[in-house]
Amino acid sequence: MSLFNINKSKKYLIAVSGGPDSVFLLCNIVKLVDPNDLVVCHVNYNFRSDSNNDQMIVTNLCKQLNLKLEILNINKDYSLLKQNFESWARAQRYDFFNMIASKYQIYNLLVAHNLNDLIETYLLQLQRNNLVDYYGLKPVSHYKDLVVYRPLLDIKKSQILNYLNTNKISYAVDSTNSDIKYQRNKIRATLNENNFTKILDQINKANNNLNSIKKIVDNYLKNNIINNELNLTKELFLLDQTCIQRIIYTYFKLINKENLLLNRSNKTISEIVKRLVNSNKNYWKINLNDHSLIKDYNKLFVIKNSLLEPKTIIINDLNDLINQTTFKNIKEIEQIILKDKNFSYVITTDYEMYKSITTIANKKTNRYFIDRKISYKTRLLSPVVYNIKNKIILNKIKKHY
């Protein structure tokens, strides 16, 4: 049975769990690549009572094939694990592979996902209605320093099992793969390989459609992200909601804030798009853990909540200005106070507090800001200085946009 056209001159790490897929991959790769250019990587989570049997199968196979083997043994009280086991295990596994890659200076990783895995992944993506970068599984992807190759994506599970059983090659059976409390296992139990051709056609069409959407998204973002802020143009609201959702999702990725959407991306992005499309408000805020997403007139940006915390100091005399570092523009404010010299003064970013009690140019501050469309970024981040007695704001209000 032939694998895809693998580069035989490269060196590879191989992820081998001891299950049929990875054992099949290993037994075939050694026929194509010099064994000295291979390093087998195995992770024993000690999650199942029989996990040591998996490790033994891998160890014996590597001895038989004269291959280098690296093992990560994890001993953990899984009752204390607060996150999804599969997600956690994947991170542990791939971080281990990345560490071994650095040790051997081999950054090509082979993993044994097969055609059934590809189909399962696609059907799971449809059920979850996730925003994905690709439907199914990519033949080549990346993780940190690793280039991850999947050479078995054209091979069915039945072909793998037939090969191993015919050649009397031992492999481990993961009992948790039949536990239908996991959604992937439910899908697996209903798969019929006779339907794969039809489903593959659906996947190809879905990815072609996705590529068309990505072109629209990439073009919009290329022209509308400035200083990590997203411009909300008229063109954006002419797009369908699928495109807008993907623009928001990709925006988070481009500003390296994708982690704020983990485990909540679908619900959160839908909420954001719903607000964008349906709300006429110039300003709104959505909390995302320790950050907030803020709509500010025709801008959208992400900011740490700590930066939004209001700061206020009282200046009763010149001594209170000495070594003052609370605000970045304190030198500018000092000059204003030194020129006015009518103590006491308030310096603050507490917009909700000062907007209704102060004035600018004989107008209530709140009305002044509204009339001049002063950005909320300015209102929330830029300090103002005013006299406690007459409550007139003395510094010029600079627009952020």
Curated annotation (Swiss-Prot):
This is tRNA(Ile)-lysidine synthase. Belongs to the tRNA(Ile)-lysidine synthase family. Its main location: cytoplasm. PANTHER family: TRNA(ILE)-LYSIDINE SYNTHASE-RELATED. One of its GO terms (cellular component) is cytoplasm. It is found in: Cytoplasm. Pfam families: ATP_bind_3. The gene is tilS. Signal peptide: none annotated.
